[in-house]
Amino acid sequence: IQTNLWLRAADRIKIVVGSFPAKTFEELFQGVFALDWENYLPLGAKFPISKAKCVKSKLHNEPSVQAISKKAVVKKLQKHYARPEGVPLQENGAEFRIEVSILKDVATVMIDTTGSSLFKRGYRADKGGAPIKENMAAAILLLSNWYPDKPLIDPTCGSGTFCIEAAMIGMKIAPGLHRSFAFEDWNWVDKDL
């Protein structure tokens, strides 16, 4: 969870719930159902299947992948929490955005801990004209062999993204310090982190 606060060049941090072969919709359903959802999703959690991506796979209909994955999670939670099948689960608690990626017939199921992308640092209200994303500027600085004890020349000097990111690196300020994250509402995350 600290990774959301401190990683400068990442876009999102996801928890991998599991991976399994999925060449058919039945294999997808059984694979998602077999995962330990009760370790992540408390009773009442909202759990949209926010994204599905299929690449070089027999399964390629992404809306169907989302619908089948949602059905499998619902069935698993109904079983675990001893809820009747005909009664829908209440989804009025914290949100856990689930993503399903199928690459070469192997499904990977993840939960997004970040929420909005990590380039949104929270220090900028107006982006200015054509800025580089903050995480990209930080990545370029980290790869450029620049160190905080050396001068930094920013020839682009647009909206100041390179200079702001360099100052944050030099002063060891966490890039996620002034923003919120999806995981902050989860009951199993230590709030003192």
Task: Give the positions of each predicted feature.
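Non-catalytic nucleic-acid substrate-recognition regions in nucleic-acid-modifying enzymes
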Residues: 1-94
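A generic local secondary-structure boundary/capping motif
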Residues: 37-38, 88, 97-99, 143, ...
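A general structural motif
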Residues: 44-46, 106, 149
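Short loop/turn motifs enriched for small/polar and acidic residues
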Residues: 50-54, 101-103, 158
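Beta-rich nucleic-acid/ligand-interaction surfaces
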Residues: 91-100, 159-160
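C-terminal edge-of-domain segments
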Residues: 98-111
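SAM-dependent Rossmann-like transferase core, predominantly class I methyltransferases
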Residues: 109-143
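Conserved S-adenosyl-L-methionine
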Residues: 132-193
